[in-house]
Swiss-Prot record:
Keyword DNA-binding: no
Protein's organism: Rana dybowskii (Dybovsky's frog)
Stretches for region Disordered: 25-65
Ranges of compositional bias, category Basic residues: 50-65
Record family assignment: Belongs to the frog skin active peptide (FSAP) family. Brevinin subfamily.
Protein name stated in the entry: Dybowskin-2CDYb
Any one Gene Ontology cellular component term annotated for this protein: extracellular region
Propeptide residue range(s): 23-47
Biased composition (Acidic residues): 26-43
Length: 65
């Protein structure tokens, strides 16, 4: 039983480290993309396309006038 707990704790610890490293890498990639003007244009286009589709399918809340 003790070795099982040790193994599970080790797996949890390694998984946590792995996730934190992935988040750091993703954040670094996002920062690099923001610095590139071409990538910024693509991000804006993607956001507008998502907005159009979400309104079309009723996923976005309508504004009250």
């Amino acid at each position: 039983m003790f070795t099982l707990k040790k193994s599970l704790l080790l797996l949890f610890f390694l998984g946590t480290i792995s996730l934190s490293l992935c988040e750091e890498e993703r954040n670094a990639d996002d920062d690099e993309r923001r610095d590139d003007p071409d990538e910024m244009d693509v991000e804006v286009e993607n956001r507008s396309a998502v907005g159009r589709h979400s309104r079309r399918f009723g996923l976005r809340k309508h504004r009250k006038h």
